[in-house]
Amino acid sequence: MDAKTKEAIDLLRTLIATPSPSRDESRTADLIFAYLAEHGAAPERLHNNVFARSAGFDPARPTLLLNSHHDTVRPAASYTRDPYAPTVEGDRLYGLGSNDAGASAVSLTQTFLTLRTRPLPFNLLLALSAEEECMGEHGMRTLLPQLGRIDMAIVGEPTGMQAAVGERGLVVLDCEARGKSGHAARNEGVNALYIALDDIARLRTFRFDRCSDLLGPIGIAVTQIAAGTQHNVVPDTCRFVADVRTTDAYTNEETVEILRRALRSEVTPRSTRIRASALNAAHPLARATAATGRESYVSPTTSDMALMPFPSLKMGPGQSSRSHTADEFVLLSEIEEGIGIYEKFIKQLAEIL
């Protein structure tokens, strides 16, 4: 194990031992800030987001963002070991946040510290963010506008160091059908439940005119429904929830408007900020992916990449299938591999640019 990998693992063990659930990450932010300062990286902080720029940062040059997050979900009830006790067993490092996304955070940190003084045709900007797991208002949503122009990004999440070049967006729709109450025995009123059922049937077979070349068709699933107060009263309202996985074929706002026109129910989006992303195959990030032998794919999960209005890909050590699971772990060898691939990828990107 080389010195960089050992440094990364030591930092990860410290982070695991420091609880950092979303919206309560101040202690891990303190640790990361101190670590970067100790290594001469001149860190800055906004809320619990910690960031640092490469030496000789020049706003006139392109900027590559290296982003991961240091918040975690809360531990699952089925843990059989202390989630905050970093434990090494063979090649496995156990602990909450080890895989999602601590391994990516420490691997990107070591990569940044190695390359921050190297002559590259672009700036490096490291941002270890908070509130990713809850898409909170004090995470990347607040930080991004304060970082200046960014041209492209690598987002560190557990992908087995393969490159997720696209993510579907997400819009959750609260839908309400309205009718008129009446006595069920006399067939009175207008049954809001039937209106909702017609709309749900329409959503089940709805097809948009355009389809994304990379992300495929927009996906719609109705996941919740509630109506009625008692058996003999025709319900005058029926509420249901639709989970809509959007693509780059339409903006989230366009998607909502198309569905509004198709339904009788009132449609209210909870948010439209989780946008789809799709990396053009000709972009330097995509070319570096191919040149370094990384497989590309479309990710089924969302991340802070959804908030980024510039080309980006998601790539990091670990496996997505371990995220949010009891007895979470990452392989030490995955961290070593991750640092090496990040460095190789950035150097290849420099050659392309």
Task: Cite the ranges covered by each PLM segment.
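N-terminal helical capping/dimerization or prosegment-like subdomains
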Residues: M1-P75, T237-V241, I258, L332-E336, ...
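Metal-dependent amide/peptide-bond hydrolase catalytic core
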Residues: A3, D24, R74, D174-L353
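Buried hydrophobic packing segments
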Residues: I32, A105-L115, L143, A196-D199, ...
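Short glycine/proline-enriched coil/turn segments at helix->beta-strand junctions
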Residues: A37-A42, H47-N48, A60-R61, R116-P121, ...
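A structural signal for short hydrophobic beta-strand segments in well-ordered beta-sheet cores
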Residues: P43, P86-V88, V222-I225
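Active-site metal-coordination/substrate-binding segment of hydrolases
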Residues: R61-L125
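Hydrophobic/aromatic beta-strand patches that form the interior of the parallel beta-sheet core
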Residues: L64-L66, A127, I154, L313-M315
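Acidic/histidine-rich catalytic neighborhood of metal-dependent amide-processing enzymes
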Residues: A101-V172, E176
